[in-house]
Amino acid sequence: MKKYLILLVLVLLTGCGRDKNKLIMVTEAGFAPYEYYEDGDIVGVDVEIAKEIAKSLDKELVIKDIYFDSILNEIKSGKADIALAGISVNEERKKEVDFSINYITSRQVVIVLKDSNITDVDNVYNKKVAVQLGSVADTYFTDKHKSTELVRQKKYLTMVEDLKGNKVDAIVMDELPAKEIVKKNTNLTILDGYIFEDTYGIAIKKGNTELLDKVNEVLNNLINDGKINEYVIKYTK
């Protein structure tokens, strides 16, 4: 029997009466190479990590695919145990949930059309920029660059269509998923440089120190053994 079960639903699971033998991971599976669909299953770097966490707890992994801006609420309400979705750690999010140790360092990069007149990342601030709703890019521009006209979307694929349709001038998003998008869309390119760096952590309900300690133990082992780098290589081939 598989140690993980994928629920391809966008509905809420009730927090009460949950099976104690299941570890519920919440994610947004449109973020390759970290989590995405392949032949009907959700796969990726974060999924591999979650499998190891579930294995260490002797539990069955259940993966819940929802919109990114709802993920932390699922953790806060107890409807999910862990959240892995390329979640950048910042002070605002730390007020809502606890985070594991950092396990990935990322950069926020800029995608444009190849024939765009935007040639430098510093040129995007007075442009029309697509960001994922609730992402650190959303927060960054909202707080620090109010002159930027933001188009907030729930899905990266929608942002790509907006860019290709000239509805926005650029997309700002995480580097590895941006590279995956550009691989599949040859009329797009990533500008040299980046907007800012960020780090990913696993979100857990505040006060659940037992689970947090176990997650950190697993992450430390994976990092020290070079496994996370192996997962990244595996899913970016």
Which residues fall in each region the model found?
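C-terminal motif of bacterial Sec signal peptides marking the signal peptidase cleavage site
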Residues: 12-15
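Short loop->beta-strand "edge-of-pocket" segments that line small-molecule binding or catalytic clefts
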Residues: 23-27, 121-134
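Periplasmic-binding protein-like
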Residues: 27-29, 104-112, 175, 179-220
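Short helices/loops that flank or line small-molecule/ion binding pockets
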Residues: 56, 64, 69-82, 96, ...
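Ligand-binding clefts/hinges and TM-proximal coupling segments of bilobed small-molecule sensing domains
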Residues: 136-154, 186-194, 219-237
